[in-house]
Amino acid sequence: MENYVDFAVQKAVELLAIDSPTGYTAEAEEFVLREFRALGFAAERTAKGGILIDLGGESTDDALLLEAHADTLGGMVAEIKGDGRLRIVNVGGMNANNAEAENCRVVTKFSGSYEGTLQLINASVHVNGDYASTKRSWDTVEVVLDEAVESADDVKALGISVGDFVCFEPRTRVTKSGYIKSRFLDDKLSVGILLGFAKYLHDEGKTPTRRVYAHVTVYEEVGHGGSASVPAGVTEAISVDMGCVGAGLQCTERQVSICAKDSGGPYSYDVVKKLIAAAQKEHADYAVDIYPYYGSDVEATLRAGYDIRHGLIGAGVYASHGYERSHRDGVLNTLRVLRGYLF
């Protein structure tokens, strides 16, 4: 699978360059649709905007669904303030603590986009004596537009209005040592991994014995991405989403994480065991962990009433929902587990 790591990382980098906070995902949807079709696979856009791909396979009675998501965290304009600054609310789990001082774009509905920065209100240390002690929250930060605006009317004249999306700069970098740093690796890195796996199937002429579908969802960050569009015959679903890295967990950015349990409860025991067996068969560097604060697309699938077994794997990602970090080795090990699970 080493031959497909560069492709997977490159496609993730390309997708990371496309703004796609939940609710504003059309360009990302088109990218995913185009890339899977370019590899020769049948792909279609669902009514919700997700991309459903048929990756081939023989038996349709025991089909497998792989799920990843292209939507990310972000913000939305909630108020145009009298001084021309913007009060925003978070979309998904965007956190004001790590979004402070980040460049962003305000995407208007009809008048293009405008650059700005998320700053603490009264952000100058030499002026604000409470700078260090102020708790960062969505009530204490604001978007400062890079436009000559001094009033709400000035901002409205640009075409900015309540409900416009605020997209944060991902700052994507791939280091010479193989580390991948960016906002929104959750879960665009996994979309790149699924594209890399699709390229492996295409280039190697591999046909799984069971039918395999992929669903790239666009509402995962708000909880209902995987709740629809499960093809007939699917009996198992596996989320390919970021693996947690942090205190009390075993996984590193260079490994593939196999989740045994998260906030929604245990994953299917049989699926977890098969994922571990696949990792061992492929000599993948893996860790099994419990994620204390986490939910996935496949749990949305279950809650929607689908009768399936479920699992979750993903490349280890540190600093989740912030400026995240993973590694090429994590990508490789995830690809290895996918191959071992199906072949």
Task: Specify the residue positions occupied by each region the protein language model found.
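N-terminal hydrophobic/helix-forming segments and targeting peptides
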Residues: M1-F343
